[in-house]
A protein has these predicted regions:
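Intrinsic disorder/low-complexity segments
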Residues: 8, 26-27, 31, 37, ...
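Long recognition/docking surfaces used for binding and targeting
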Residues: 1-26
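Hydrophobic beta-strand core residues of beta-sandwich domains
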Residues: 24-25, 29-30, 45, 176
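Local alpha-helix boundary/kink/capping signal
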Residues: 15, 23, 60, 146-147
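A conserved structural/catalytic subdomain of Rossmann-like adenosyl-cofactor enzymes
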Residues: 124-357
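N-terminal leader/targeting segments
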Residues: 16-18, 23-25, 41, 195, ...
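Conserved S-adenosyl-L-methionine
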Residues: 31-138, 143-145, 154, 162, ...
Length: 357
């Protein structure tokens, strides 16, 4: 039933009402709204039971997750599973009613017949959800702050801050069941920030849960809307630790140019990232000079839980051999003689010109 409900969702999105709405949205500036990098979303799509995006925007991540499930399991899903797929499997929250309407339309056009998207300030005391979801896929607001009095006390216990990018990470941990998996996009500052709130949040992920991967992305992936450098954090909620080695990947290209035009290009690291992430046992021999490698938990702890790849990446410098000093000086003297000869010839030509006058 649901398999036939959206035969060509891409065509609908491109030419239908949703495409028109999205083109309009791209021109507006809704406070705190973040238009998702759709090309990055497949990194976050894993086998799902119940998924949430507490800052869903246009529901780009949830749609990508639904497409992943359709492509992989469509032929084997039971009617009960399709009912679950079209109903309670995907949940989103946002504080912008326009975005909620768009996200509902987006999900319905992708076979989610009863999208569960609600108006809710996810990091406020209003949100009391805990231990409910098995997967969290999110791109929370960057560089924002919220009123200190409205922040849920549970979140402040993990990271005492007003910064949304930190509060949402603490929120993901609270909203997921034990064993739940999260893939979220964060600004680079989360990885190396030196404040107490930054360090305590990173320590929470590394020491009390299982941080699996840090995928650094180039700064242009969100252009023309934002030029901030970002990364994908992938972790599992355990409440009992589990981090042994963290996998780092330095993404150079995502299939699109990194300027404001974001034109398609051949270079694309995303297929390589997905392949390597699903075969991490092969990564143990990778060197720090390569594009991806493991870093032991203890080394991360010794570096104040810094999660920036540049902290651990080794740059292989190729030595440059220069000629002897005597040879360089001889070349300089030769060039000076050539210049002097040319100057003298130029003077002669100028003198000849004067005599002709």
């Amino acid at each position: 039933m649901y398999a036939q409900a959206a035969i060509k969702p891409n065509t609908l999105l491109r030419n239908g009402a949703y495409g028109i709405v999205m083109r309009g949205v791209q021109k507006c500036t809704c406070a705190g709204a973040s238009l998702r990098g759709r090309n990055s979303a497949p990194l976050c799509c894993i086998n799902l039971d119940t998924a949430t995006d507490p800052a869903c925007g246009t529901a780009g991540f949830l749609v990508s997750a639904s497409e992943y499930i359709r492509n992989k399991y469509e032929d084997t899903m039971t009617p009960e599973q399709w009912d679950h797929f079209g109903g309670e499997m995907f949940t989103g929250f946002d504080t912008d009613r326009t975005m909620l309407r768009i996200s509902a339309m987006n999900l319905m056009l992708h076979s989610i017949g009863n999208p569960d998207v609600d108006y809710r300030d996810s990091v406020s005391k209003q949100n009391q959800i805990r231990g409910k979801y098995t997967v969290c896929l999110a791109n929370p607001p960057f560089k924002g702050t919220v009123d200190a009095g409205s922040i849920n006390d549970d979140l402040k216990a993990v990271t005492d801050t007003k910064k949304t990018e930190l509060l949402f990470l603490a929120l993901f941990l609270r909203m997921m069941k034990t064993g739940g998996r999260c893939a979220c996009i964060v600004p680079d500052g989360v990885l190396f920030g030196s404040s107490k709130a930054h360090k305590s949040l990173r320590k929470e992920l590394v020491e009390n849960h299982q941080l699996r991967a840090v995928i650094s992305m180039p700064s242009g992936v969100f252009k023309p809307y934002a030029g901030v450098s970002t990364a994908v954090l992938i972790f599992t909620k355990t409440g009992a630790g589990g981090t042994e080695n963290v996998w780092f990947y330095d993404m150079k290209a995502d299939g699109f140019s990194l300027d404001d035009k974001r034109s398609e290009i051949e270079e694309n690291d995303i297929p390589d990232i997905i392949e390597r992430f699903h075969n991490l046992e092969r990564e143990s021999t990778r060197q720090r000079t390569e594009q991806s490698f493991f870093v032991p938990k203890q080394e991360i702890a010794d570096n104040n839980y810094d999660l920036s790849i540049n902290k651990y990446k080794e740059v292989e410098y190729i030595p440059v051999e220069y000629p002897p000093t005597s040879e360089i000086l001889a070349d300089i003297e030769r060039l000076n003689r050539e210049i002097e000869t040319e100057v003298q010839e130029l003077k002669k030509l100028l003198e000849m010109g004067k005599s002709d006058l």
